[in-house]
Amino acid sequence: MDGAIHRAAGPELLAECRTLHGCETGDVKITRGYRLPAHRVIHAVGPVWHGGQRREDEALASCYARALELCETHGLASVAFPAISTGIYRFPADRAARIAVSTSVKTLPVAPTIRRIIFCCFSDDSAALHAREMAEFGSPCAE
């Protein structure tokens, strides 16, 4: 995901990222979107899955909560999330979907500028997991 974003945004994004001095697991930073249609890019450092013994759930939840807080700080009305950490970091997809949706729903009251959250799912299975979790919260889901 990171490589695709950087390729599409252009070299200016990497140049700005180098000024951010890294980011801890579970935290996020924000940059301009440059050549992307998005005005901003929120960079999240999701946890590597180690069997759930290293506070991975808390770190993943922190990525979503902190991203929504940054949206509020910057007056952003919408945000799109991939399924953070479910690729090469091997976070279980069902657990990640539950954390993504529940954290987003719980964080929305402190982020009233946000009107739309999009979960960008790159497989039918991931989309089904996110839709199931949204249904648990009574949230609308558009395919």
Label the model's feature ranges.
Residues M1-H74:
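Glycine-/small-residue-enriched capping loops at alpha/beta junctions
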Residues V48-E143:
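Phosphate/ribose-phosphate-bearing ligand recognition and processing surfaces
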